[in-house]
């Protein structure tokens, strides 16, 4: 039987790093904390990840998730579970002005507000 990792455990999936925020057999969640290759140009934050048979919903983004991301040109956010409370204060402060952020259509208005409130430069394009 698949056992979820403990709260605080760091998981690496497809070049992204996550921290377990809730550990249950059903309903485990993780926070996107960054990515391993800082030269990566495209980063996708998925709706969920699966590690050793356990599914974790991606529900938050950590404060330093995008620090030192000088090469990033496209950030695709697929999860629909982000809120102002689940995105750390200065998360998007260091994202370059040329970066394009793609968000789910149904969350465009809400995410635009959240991302700007969390330090995203007004020159960064947000697309549906």
For the regions a protein language model found, what residue spans apply to each?
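Short, surface-exposed basic-aromatic patches at helix termini and helix-loop junctions that form
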Residues: 93, 116-118
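Short, surface-exposed terminal/edge motifs of secreted or surface/virion proteins that either
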Residues: 111-115
């Amino acid at each position: 039987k698949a056992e979820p990792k403990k709260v605080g455990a760091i998981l690496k999936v497809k070049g992204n790093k996550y921290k377990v925020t809730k550990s249950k057999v059903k309903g485990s969640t993780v926070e996107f904390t960054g990515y391993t290759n800082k030269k990566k140009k495209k980063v996708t934050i998925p709706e969920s990840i699966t590690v050793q048979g356990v599914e974790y919903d991606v529900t938050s983004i950590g404060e330093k998730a995008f620090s030192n991301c000088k090469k990033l040109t496209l950030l695709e956010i697929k999860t629909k579970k982000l809120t102002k409370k689940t995105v750390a204060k200065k998360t998007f402060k260091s994202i370059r002005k040329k970066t394009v952020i793609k968000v789910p259509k149904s969350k465009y208005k809400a995410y635009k507000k959240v991302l700007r409130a969390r330090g995203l430069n007004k020159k960064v394009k947000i697309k549906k």
